[in-house]
Each structure stands twice: as structure tokens, then as C-alpha cells.
Amino acid sequence: MLSWNNSWHSSSTENRTMEREIVASYEPKKNNEIRMFESSDEMATDLAEYISQVSEISIKERGYFAIALSGGPLISFMRKLCEAPYNKTLDWSKWYIFWADERAVAKNHVDSYYKSTKEDFLSKVPILNGHVYSINDNVTVEDAATDYEFVIRQLVKIRTVGVSESNDCPKFDLILLSIGSDGHVASLFPNHPALELKDDWVTYITDSPVPPPERITFTLPVINSASNIAVVATGEDKAKAVYFAISDGAEGPDAPSIPARMVQPTDGKLVWFLDKASASFLEAKTKNDGYEHPKY
């Protein structure tokens, strides 16, 4: 694994040299960290340890661990939490599960994030059923968003979910996101009006550019109010989106405004988990001074 923030470390001379070059070109913003992995198994191992540490700290400080998940291949990278030592050592009774976004489909539908999360994660760990806050799939997408925000507001009142010191938004202990090839996070898509919402905690869309069209999603203020945010990216098809989300070279009037770049914690920490393919444009920039910035 390569990892860089204010310091850097690596096991091989070659990796140390490459990492030093990347640090020079991509100095992360304050409280941001980027980790790059050689394999999916290495990423899953590190992600499990990261989540375990955030969980332990949150439970020690607050008595709860409130985590919001998203969809895509993200859940598969949590698989190590279902194995020793984590399945025995984590205080699962203090975990509270939410979704940063969800598709407006039945819970048993193949497109449901709840379904995939239950099959690949929840069914394998002893999290209490009453601590799993899924979306109401028996109402319209608009009502589902309203209901979900109401539920979260009640949990903020009793501090099961924390509250931001900077605003009245919920302060989740961890929001775990993936990134789309277009740079979307949660169900916040490029140039969508939902990106401009300031007061809503949860909103809905009916025009997702990728099916299914109806979804609910956390808004940017809620995402950015989290204590910790982790974004997982894998595959070459994510490389341009990762570049435009992270790179200072992607700034300027001609740079695309992608939602992933708008993920900047107000008072928390952001960690990017990247495989080599998704980080390929970042690496290419360090190896060739004449590298032309990718274009959408």
C-alpha cells in the first residue's frame, strides 16, 4: 500500500520514490489522505482496519458508531469485517447502519442497496436488526426521502447520531462512498440541482442518468459534516473521475465540476482508497511532465 498525507511511508525503494513524486504533485488538502493499493485484497484488509479503528474511537467517545453506506462494489470491500478478528472483537451492538443513498425499489429487488448489503455484510455480522435504518420502500420516493430525514432528525435529538459543531447537520461517524465514472457520489450526479441544496438533509431525484431513475440521497452538507468520509475507487473507468476529484491540476474554469470534488469535510477527515487502475491518471502525471490532462 502507498499512503500519503503529511507524511509518507512505503516498503520498497521504488515505491518510496514514486510516492515522493506523487506527494509533490498532489499534496492533499488539510485532513485529506490518499491510499493506493496493489490488489483488491490489500484494499479490503486496510479498509477493514480503518473502519475498525473509526468504530472503536466513536464508541469510546460517544457510545455509538453511526455509519452510512452507499452502493456499487463498495460492500464487497467490507468483507474482511466479517472475518476474524473483527467479527469477534468489534462491538457490533453499538453499530447503527444508514444509507447515504438508495434506489427507490423494493428491498428484495436486485437493484436494492439494502438487499446487497444484507446479503454480503449484514447477514454475516451480529448487528442488531433494530439498528439498521433502511429506506421505506412502500411510499413514493419523495415521501421516502422525507421519512428518512425525519428518522435521522429523531436520532440526532437523542445523539445516537452526532450533530455538527458548525451547523445543525447530523454528524455521522463515518460515511462510506464509492465514485462513479462520471464523478458522482451517493446519488449526487454532475450538474444536478440536488448539489445546490443547503437546508435539506435528505433529498430525492427522479432523473438519475443511470437506472433506476428514482433515488434518495444525502445532500452535500450532510456528507461534508461527517467526522470521517472514505471514498473507494476501483477500475480504470474511474481514473478520470479520480483525477478531477483529487488533482490540483484539475482546477480552473475549464475543469469539470464533479460531485466527488465537492466532498470536503467541514470538520472531519477524508480518506481516498484507490487501486492502481483508478489512480492511473495521477501516476501518469508524475511520470511525464508533458502529460496532457485528461478530458471528459
From Swiss-Prot:
One of its GO terms (biological process) is carbohydrate metabolic process. The keyword Nucleotide-binding does not apply. GO terms for molecular function: 6-phosphogluconolactonase activity. It catalyses: 6-phospho-D-glucono-1,5-lactone + H2O = 6-phospho-D-gluconate + H(+). It holds the Pfam family Glucosamine_iso. Its EC number is 3.1.1.31. Keywords: Hydrolase. Pathway: Carbohydrate degradation; pentose phosphate pathway; D-ribulose 5-phosphate from D-glucose 6-phosphate (oxidative stage): step 2/3. Hydrolysis of 6-phosphogluconolactone to 6-phosphogluconate. Belongs to the glucosamine/galactosamine-6-phosphate isomerase family. 6-phosphogluconolactonase subfamily. This is Probable 6-phosphogluconolactonase 1. It comes from Oryza sativa subsp. indica (Rice). The lineage of its organism: Eukaryota, Viridiplantae, Streptophyta, Embryophyta, Tracheophyta.
